[in-house]
Amino acid sequence: NRAAEFANLTAETAAALAESLRTGYAYPAAALHRNWELTLLNQFHDILPGSALGEVYEVSQQQYGEILASDARITDDALHTVAALVKTDRPGVVVFNQLGFARDTVVRVACGASGITDDGHPLPCHTENGALTFVAKDLPAKGWRFYPFADAEPETPCAEVTENDGGYIIDTPLYHIVFNGCGEITALLDKEAGRELIPAGQCANELQLFEDRPDEYDAWNLEKYYRRHRFALDGAARLTVAENSPVCCRLHLERAISRSQLVQDITLYPHSRRIDFATHIDWREQHVLLKAAFPVDICADRAQYDIQFGSIARDTHTNTSWDEARFEVCAHKWADLSEPGYGAALLNDGRYGYDVHDGVLRLSLLRAATYPDPHADQGAHDFTYALLPHLGDWRQGGVILAGYDLNAPALPLAVAAQPAGTLPAAYSQFRIDAPNVVLETVKKAEDGSGLILRLYESWGTRTRAALALPD
């Protein structure tokens, strides 16, 4: 569902950009309308939460495949149309940013090059298996930037890595982190803040498995008693260093979770505070709940949760009956726990269940109900969640942008030298001068009369903002 929503938004943005630049591209209104209709159909109240019959999900998976394939074609056609007109004096990469924020982000593109620059300055990059991975800096909002290829620079590791009793101690420009052999974080020193994030004796990225047997309505309900029935996870685990390049330091974890097998890539970046946990799991359980827990040394009685076009604060205690009933709550891209001056967010790209209590951020990863579908959620799953320690609260800490960045990777296209191109090397279709105003949607009006922009104020504060339109 999340992937379809963002694919629709990206396709709309790309198509609107290509047509508005008078490239000869025609906005595919009918196809986009169909993609949104199918997305909304699959948000029916039994399909979306996983409480429908198994046969329903056979159709649903097929329809999601149609949505994603159609959006990919639209996006690819639109961006290739634009990229072919960007004026360049040598080969390189045009990176498109579909978000309403300017950003620095990691991109990967298949090409034969081994180096890349920005205004003559070499960018951190890494080559592997015919692909170039680099940090695209200063990407304009709702636009693109061209990065020319260059000769390879020596690849300097971004982290100092030391083996430590089956795990690793990793020093990056931002963090000093200790991982045990299960991929859990036993210590995290934030160098800029000068503080330890993980409480002594506890572990972050702790995978927790609970018994999950509701009194009734197996796929619908989660009972609060589940917390009293936790299973020990003592399966084999193996942690190795997969990459230590100028772009990132990546650990590779293979671990048994009861009868299931988990593979996880844990990635730290020198340019970003985000720590990613890209997860693949072959799920073979019944009547259990899997969560990822992140205890943090942060004192706050309220947590902030991302919702549609905003966020909402909820208590982290159970002093009232209604707070006690919120032992599990819904959120979209992130949940954040902050005290004055510092905080931590737990981001995701497609999980919706959170609980934040007693200084622990937890994200529900998978369940294993057997009614009405006896095979619900069995098989392969791929998702990413991320920890984002930050200065300030969720507003000053860039949590909103980080949530969008995780869910909407930038889009790179390799191009040849195009000296006859008519479009600039860097371009922003729309820009906003207020960090709390989010431009989420750019689409063609349903009657074809112009473009529609959907913006929202994200901090809950009065704001005066200027929207810069294209020339």
Please describe what each predicted stretch is.
Residues 65-69, 76, 80-471:
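C-terminal (or distal) subdomains of carbohydrate-active enzymes
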Residues 1-91, 402, 406-409:
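Metal- or metallocofactor-binding catalytic centers and their adjacent structured scaffolds
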